[in-house]
A protein has these predicted regions:
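Glycine-rich phosphate/diphosphate-binding loop of Rossmann-like nucleotide-binding domains
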Residues: 1-29, 33
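Short acidic, glycine/serine/threonine-rich loops at helix termini
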Residues: 1-8, 38-41, 68-72, 105-106
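Charged helix-capping and loop-helix junction motifs
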Residues: 9-10, 42-44, 76-77
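C-terminal functional extensions of proteins
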Residues: 12, 16, 38, 68, ...
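Structural motif
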Residues: 24-27, 55-57, 82-83, 90-93
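Short, ordered loop/turn segments at secondary-structure junctions
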Residues: 29-32, 62-63, 97-98
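A structured beta-alpha segment of the ubiquitous adenosine-cofactor-binding alpha/beta core
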Residues: 31, 41-51
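A C-terminal functional module that forms or caps the active site or interfaces directly
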Residues: 50-57, 61-76, 80-84
């Protein structure tokens, strides 16, 4: 956290998301432990309904997102599908060289669903 171009992007994206979807619980920039760990969330953002209970994590760029999802996948033994790229004119998917057949299948389903939207 702190002042940087990435933090500015997250602040701007948060404002846009809140304007477009006021019905969603959205908080702005916070460190992962604050977003994920209830005790840390209560300590750092006591008035937030999201801190410590976040279910969606938005990263400021592809590299940061890639690092985050690979850590979760490899250390946490979580199923990770992605990265899922948004905001382009057509669906685009990117697969790691370490992807297996199931990864390709699942990301293909997501890409096909994006194409139908």
């Amino acid at each position: 956290s702190g002042a940087s171009e990435d933090v500015t992007k997250v602040v701007e994206a948060t404002k846009i998301a809140k304007d477009l979807r006021p019905d969603l619980k959205i908080d702005g920039e916070m460190q992962f432990d604050t977003a994920f760990v209830p005790e840390v969330g209560r300590l750092k953002f006591p008035n937030s309904s999201v801190a410590g209970n976040a279910s969606v994590f938005v990263f400021p760029d592809l590299q940061s997102g890639n690092i985050g999802y690979k850590i979760a996948q490899r250390l946490g033994n979580f199923e990770a599908i992605g990265p899922i790229l948004q905001g382009l004119n057509k669906p685009v998917s990117d697969l790691s060289r370490g992807s297996n057949e199931e990864d390709v299948y699942k990301l293909s389903i997501i890409t096909a669903a994006q194409a139908l939207m």
